[in-house]
Design a protein with these regions (language model features):
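Extracytoplasmic/lumenal domain signature
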Residues: 1-209
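N-terminal exported-region signature
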Residues: 208-241
Length: 241
């Protein structure tokens, strides 16, 4: 109805200059946003502070969210040159933060660059380096890639030419750069562009609560294609995937 929600506005000591990201995990929704007071905040749906991560400088880019085997992980960069990764409770992931040596200028995105089942984190700094890290914080092979001009913006990753490997697209101060990573990879269902999707919703729903649906011991039914009020076993048998 346009009214300010109970518990809001949330007040920090400086200004927010980025789009917030909403995370849903374990039946809870919370808001994440970095602030010019050097702090990354997570805010519960009732307006209370969930956690706060202090960094060494301002935060001017939105977070990226990655589903891991232990639930969602929240990645964000700071102008202190570090790329951070935390759990929904604000605890640092093993191997993080990573010191890149230069200001983080774009939101991180994700893809399985070498198709080994473990995604990589792609980011850029205010200098001329394109950075890719493995989930444990170690650098991807042949990274960083150094360019002649500084980057300006967030990367996106996709298999543009349908050859099975991944291209990284990112803007610079004078051009659009495309980097063809020669390893076979996949973007899968990963947050592979700014704010997660083409609609730029900045919303992430964790898949850890998913369940398997079965009918008469037949799993994985296509419920979209299942007609209503059909009980005959013959007709039902044609709809499982």
């Amino acid at each position: 109805n346009g009214q300010i929600a109970d518990g809001f506005p949330f007040t920090a000591s400086s200004d927010f200059r980025l789009a917030p990201v909403i995370v849903e995990a374990n039946g809870e929704k919370f808001i994440t946003a970095g602030n010019r007071d050097n702090t990354f905040y997570a805010i519960n749906s009732d307006g209370s502070q969930r956690f706060a991560i202090e960094t060494g400088d301002d935060i001017s880019t939105s977070a990226g969210i990655l589903e891991t085997e232990n639930g969602p992980a929240i990645f964000f960069g700071s102008e202190d040159g570090k790329l951070y990764a935390v759990t929904p409770d604000g605890n640092a992931l093993p191997g993080w933060p990573v010191d890149t040596g230069s200001e983080i200028v774009g939101s991180p995105v994700f893809a399985d660059m070498d198709n080994n089942g473990s995604p990589e984190i792609i980011s850029a700094v205010s200098g001329t380096d394109l950075l890719i890290f493995r989930l444990d914080g170690s650098p991807y092979s042949d990274i960083p890639i150094d360019f002649e001009v500084p980057f300006a913006g967030s990367p996106a990753v996709h298999d543009l030419d349908n050859d099975g490997d991944i291209e990284v697209l990112i803007g610079s101060t004078n051009s659009l750069i495309t980097v063809d990573i020669k390893d076979i990879g996949s973007t899968g269902e990963y947050w592979n562009m700014y704010r997660g999707n083409l609609q730029r919703t900045g919303y992430f729903g964790s898949g850890t609560d998913a369940i398997t649906i079965s009918v008469e011991n037949i799993p994985d039914w296509n419920l979209v294609g299942l007609p209503l009020n059909v009980s005959d076993p013959f007709h039902l048998s044609i709809f499982p995937d």
